[in-house]
Amino acid sequence: VNERPALGLIVVAAAGFLGIVFDINSVFGFAAESFLTIERSSIVTTDDGDGDGGELTAELDVEGVQIPTNGTHGAFGYGMITDDGDETILVAHTHAGLLDSEAQRFIEDPNWHNHFVKFGDVEHCGEDQGIVDITWQSPGEVGIDDNIVRISDVPTGEIEGQHSSMTGESLSFTLGEAVSDVISFKLDSVFGDDGLEAVCVTDIRSAEEVVNLD
């Protein structure tokens, strides 16, 4: 498995992940992470009929009363997996301490934003998946309203993006329209003798209910 793209991301993310992945107090961790339980997700996709794909809109209702937006609960997010794309996953996530998106104003900005990503087998992640490709662009819009995530205007057809390492590498992503799973996840970092070696996707949980409203 080619791990090079993940290492490109790591160059940008190293300082941030080191500072944020251990922020959650272990004593109150269970209660604090209720926002990782997606009780219901509603998905709508539209197709403009020109063969270039359409747009995806989604609403995720999570357990608890408030999804963190200030970066104090570490790096976590939500994702949508489709059956008819090119293994591209739409993720919306938050993190303070790293700058990996055009939607962030500065490195400590925990502003929620979207990415297209691809997960893959990464040696340092063991049985977990690792990030092997990720866009600098933030496709569509995402907003948090108490315990509800609203995502809109996400293109489902092929798009060209720039790798978030800002190397200028061009990437192609096709999300697709047939959403098969909606997930929550946390991000973890792996360090070696030479520093940060991988960004792993951990604690993946599927939504309790996924409703496609097409």
Which residues does each predicted region cover?
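Secretory targeting signatures
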Residues: 1-29
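Boundary at the C-terminal end of the N-terminal hydrophobic targeting segment
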Residues: 29-31, 116
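A broad structural signal for short, well-ordered beta-strand segments within beta-sheet-rich domains
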Residues: 32-46, 51-56, 123, 166-168, ...
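Surface-exposed, glycine/proline- and aromatic-rich loop segments on solvent-exposed faces
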Residues: 36-120
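A generic structural signal for beta-strand entry/edge sites
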Residues: 51-59, 146-150, 170
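Mature secreted bioactive peptide module from preproproteins
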Residues: 94-95, 109-130, 145, 167-169, ...
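Short helix-loop boundary/capping segments
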Residues: 123-162
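Acidic/polar low-complexity flexible segments
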Residues: 160-214
